[in-house]
């Protein structure tokens, strides 16, 4: 069996590193034979901090730097240091910025500072805190502050989807639907909110629940993994969503990212918005 190539990937930014992380991870997904060790260097705003990055690069390994640095002098310094250590250095936005500039015959703003720590950053932190405190039907007293409400039976990816959306700036409440138990919130009070139901194939849900019980070293709960019980739960959830005209998503073959992307589309449609980020 062929060994995987190993790469130390250093992600450098003078801000939060979100852009370079997103680009880098999307890029390495195309190389399944590659094993990547990721090093994140955010808020690198001085030559001294660049020096610290370079000191942590092992010359005995394959290294690559990907970066977003706004300051021209600092960017030049980083490239010089990388060249001196024979490390390849890739600016992830330079090509795109150059193409836009050439196409529109405009120059870039020298004072631009993508993802500067400001309202956007703190709004996102607020969304994450709100979503965590409203996981699994908790603290519904201020559900009116939510942007999105997710409902579904147990083990349908409600929590990870909620957290993913929170990192995109959405305040999310997720509510478990339990068979024969009344919904813990009056649907009339959330009529103006986007409420999305997550459904799943019964056989797949049973498999997920069994794996969950095994991982927690619990004895198999007959009702929890009973086919009849699971089908009843799913059907009851679908009826609740249909009655309240809430859209549903079949998550059987979907990743968390795909589920979240669909929910964002629903949100934009409901609020006559374009784009995919709230903040």
From Swiss-Prot:
Keyword NAD among UniProt keywords: no
Keywords: Kinase, Nucleotide-binding, Serine/threonine-protein kinase, Transferase
Gene Ontology molecular functions: ADP binding; ATP binding; phosphotransferase activity, phosphate group as acceptor; protein serine/threonine kinase activity
Catalytic reactions of this protein: N(tele)-phospho-L-histidyl/L-threonyl-[pyruvate, phosphate dikinase] + ADP = N(tele)-phospho-L-histidyl/O-phospho-L-threonyl-[pyruvate, phosphate dikinase] + AMP + H(+); N(tele)-phospho-L-histidyl/O-phospho-L-threonyl-[pyruvate, phosphate dikinase] + phosphate + H(+) = N(tele)-phospho-L-histidyl/L-threonyl-[pyruvate, phosphate dikinase] + diphosphate
Binding site for ADP: 152-159
Documented EC number(s): 2.7.11.32, 2.7.4.27
InterPro entries in the record: Kinase-pyrophosphorylase (IPR005177), PPDK_reg (IPR026565)
Function recorded in the entry: Bifunctional serine/threonine kinase and phosphorylase involved in the regulation of the pyruvate, phosphate dikinase (PPDK) by catalyzing its phosphorylation/dephosphorylation.
HAMAP family: PDRP
UniProt cross-references to PANTHER family, sorted A to Z: PYRUVATE, PHOSPHATE DIKINASE REGULATORY PROTEIN 1, CHLOROPLASTIC
NCBIfam families xrefs: PRK05339.1
Family classification: Belongs to the pyruvate, phosphate/water dikinase regulatory protein family. PDRP subfamily.
Protein name in the entry: Putative pyruvate, phosphate dikinase regulatory protein
